[in-house]
């Protein structure tokens, strides 16, 4: 009975470790590709003298510094989008939460909050506000293009 219990416990532990390994490996691959993409973007910004990145320590310090910049920025933009969607659902008749005005307000609030909450605190990343506006605007347009607004894409009427 104890041997059976330990065998079952070992099987559960092994399964958990395999799932954890797959999760960590896929996350590492995603972060690697994200890092290469951001490295390319930073090289473009440096080449055209649109940005300056002066934090150069060890690889892990750089990964933590620049990675936290991206992660915190993502959470700010994510929070603004969900808050704006919540307002749109709560106030469907309000003209500010319909059409292009809604998207312009969402984009403006997200960009402004990102700049003042995240960007100004990272003193080793020097990018002008208008460059940040263009980058976030491009990402916002891509989000609208590839993730269109709909209640249910599989619902055919």
UniProtKB/Swiss-Prot annotation:
Keyword Transmembrane helix included in the entry's annotation: yes
InterPro entries membership: SepA
Subcellular location per the Swiss-Prot or TrEMBL entry: Cell membrane
Topology of the protein relative to the lipid bilayer: Multi-pass membrane protein
Chief localization: membrane
Entry's transmembrane regions: 18-38, 63-83, 100-120, 122-142
Keywords carried by this UniProt record: Cell membrane, Membrane, Transmembrane, Transmembrane helix, Transport
The keyword Transmembrane helix is annotated on this UniProt entry: yes
Record's GO cellular component terms: plasma membrane
Family under the similarity heading: Belongs to the multidrug resistance efflux pump SepA family.
Function: Involved in multidrug efflux.
Protein name per UniProt: Multidrug resistance efflux pump SepA
Gene label: sepA
């Amino acid at each position: 009975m104890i041997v059976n219990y330990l065998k079952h416990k070992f099987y559960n532990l092994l399964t958990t470790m395999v799932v954890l390994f797959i999760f960590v490996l896929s996350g590492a691959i995603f972060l690697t590709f994200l890092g290469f993409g951001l490295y390319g973007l930073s090289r473009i910004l440096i080449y055209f003298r649109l940005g300056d990145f002066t934090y150069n320590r060890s690889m892990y310090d750089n990964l933590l510094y620049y990675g936290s910049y991206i992660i915190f920025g993502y959470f700010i933009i994510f929070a603004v989008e969900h808050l704006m969607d919540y307002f749109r659902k709560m106030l469907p008749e309000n003209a500010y939460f319909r059409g292009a005005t809604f998207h312009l307000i969402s984009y403006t609030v997200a960009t402004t909050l990102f700049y003042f909450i995240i960007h100004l605190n990272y003193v080793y990343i020097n990018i002008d506000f208008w460059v940040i506006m263009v980058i976030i605007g491009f990402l916002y347009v891509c989000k609208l293009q590839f993730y269109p607004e709909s209640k249910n894409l599989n619902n055919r009427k």
